[in-house]
Amino acid sequence: LPFTIRAYFYGGSGEIKIVHSLVFDGDQNKYFIRSLGIRFDVPMREALYNRHVAFSCSDGGVWSEPVQPLIGRRILTLDGYGPLQKMQMSGERIPDYEKFDAKNRSLLDNWASWDSYRLSQLNADAFTIRKRTNGNNPWIGTFSGTRSNGYAFVGDVTGGLSVGYKDFWQSYPSSIEITNANSDKASLT
């Protein structure tokens, strides 16, 4: 499909505005465009528990979660540090894996990590956020609301990428998906 992309760069700003258009010159009765998206690859340099994702919710709220939440039936501990889960949820760096003793490393080795996340605005009054551990497992619902502003972030404690989709909820059905969050290169589409 022929398409045009315009990118706007502003001095002193880290923001890039992208406007795209495509020309569909096919037979609408014979061909159908199933989806259209722009994919960004994001390097993930930190341990799974130091990686984070976030989506905007209704009324300016934000849903966020670490790729590997430090929560389970046992509490992860490290001498000289306070509550590690609280640090993690605040976006602070959790110490390197090697600093933990064997018992705590076992917890880190066995706690779930989430690979994919999806924000979907399926109608004017409902969005969902779902996640899964890998492509072979089903999506599970984590949060729902009315109208998302269409913002997403994926990255680690050293940085990442955020995108905003203008008029997201008004453009339903729309979705923003993060995949490969537990690999060296996450994708945001």
Task: For each feature predicted by the language model, list its residue ranges.
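Beta-strand/loop-rich accessory regions of lumenal/periplasmic or secreted enzymes
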Residues: 1-189
